[in-house]
């Protein structure tokens, strides 16, 4: 008897199960519809942080073409990117000022979000400073938006709970940057540059305990999309 082979793309296609002997299920990402534009390409730089995979997973969940890349990869070997995330890590950036090739990545003309160590490195690279925190933070903390919260905090409450895990912190905001969020223990919980393409977060939006972390990733994705459409 002749077998009928059907391929089912999740979310989009159904089949007549009675006439089909074999069914192959293929997960289709939300961006893969026939009329959709190509997905945004935003990679995550692995700086040795314990939650780097969560950043990658969040981007993928939100429909982004994303990979985790080592921070030693030369710029010449990067994909054509719409955005980049500099992850957190064990490196004491406030003491060493070093973080792989992240300095070279910051020369790229794309939106970049630094998280924890990535945030601290960004501050130092652009002329600010990071130092050992007087009160290291580990666990849930409450932050308050300042200066309107900037683009990353768009459509999130003025006061919210986030997840912290840091020994160092930004002590001096770079020229051309402004603070977007603060807490009682850390003045620079968030920062953004005046050009609107460099962003830093001291806390970890990728951790579930950060109430509006997904919103922040979505806001960054929208920034990357707008930047691509302008090119």
Model-derived regions: residue spans:
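Short, flexible loop/turn segments with low-complexity composition
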Residues: 228-231
């Amino acid at each position: 008897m002749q077998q009928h082979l059907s391929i089912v793309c999740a979310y989009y296609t159904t089949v007549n199960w009675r006439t089909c002997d074999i069914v192959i299920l293929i997960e289709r990402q939300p961006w893969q519809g026939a009329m959709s534009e190509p997905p945004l390409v935003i990679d995550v730089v692995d700086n040795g942080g314990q939650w780097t995979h969560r950043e990658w997973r969040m981007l993928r969940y939100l429909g982004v073409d994303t990979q985790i890349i080592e921070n030693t990869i030369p710029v010449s070997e990067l994909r054509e990117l719409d955005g980049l995330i500099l992850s957190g890590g064990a490196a004491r950036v406030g003491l060493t000022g070093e973080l792989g090739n992240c300095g070279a990545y910051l020369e790229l003309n794309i939106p970049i979000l630094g998280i924890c160590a990535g945030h601290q490195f960004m501050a130092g690279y652009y002329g600010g400073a990071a130092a050992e925190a007087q009160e290291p933070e580990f666990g849930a903390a409450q932050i308050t938006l300042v200066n309107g919260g900037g683009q990353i905090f768009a459509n999130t409450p003025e006061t919210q709970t986030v997840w912290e895990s840091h020994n160092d912190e930004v002590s001096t905001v770079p020229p051309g940057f402004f603070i977007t969020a603060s807490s009682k223990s850390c003045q620079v919980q968030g920062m953004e540059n005046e050009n609107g393409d460099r962003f830093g977060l001291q806390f970890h939006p990728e951790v579930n305990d950060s109430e509006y972390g997904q919103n922040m990733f979505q806001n960054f994705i929208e920034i990357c999309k707008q930047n691509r459409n302008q090119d």
